[in-house]
Amino acid sequence: VTAPSYVNGILDQLRSRHPDIYQMLLYVEQPFPYDLEKNQIDVHSVSARKPLFMDESAHDWRLVRLGRQLGWSGVALKTCKTQTGALLTLCWAKAHGMDLMVQDLTNPMLAQIPHVLLAAHAGTIMGVETNAMQFYPDASLPEQDVHPGLYRRRDGSVELSTISGPGFGYHLGGIRRELPPPVVSVGA
């Protein structure tokens, strides 16, 4: 989709034909091409109807800046695209009044911890998207033994009370994960 009028038409029809559903719609996510630099589409008319979130386009805070200039009103943060990148984008977006969400591309095992910690402190529109337990339910069993509430959803929520201390609160000493032997050893 490259025409804001197309997205606006869908939203306008939804608002007139099904106003209850339109009211429940929290946001629109990345309906336009991912490469913002090549596709500099003015989307202010869409974000005037519903919050418009960058997702795949938001892999660098400078692209988030460009997106905001084009009319995007929110950004999806993903620690799987680097923790530092997510933090830089978070800071820039917050400083410029953009809405935030934290999503994953399936963060199992230890990756789940910084992911949910970012969401807990970011001020998102509604919690965190975390789907590793859905797609890879057994991948995080060693971590789940130490952080049970983090790897099991209850009533749509995860629980972070076991995360504390240094190193993102991993508690690595208690996690019994067997790793394969290293491929390369330096200085052995």
PLM-predicted stretches and their roles:
Residues 1-105, 110-112:
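Catalytic core of soluble alpha/beta enzymes
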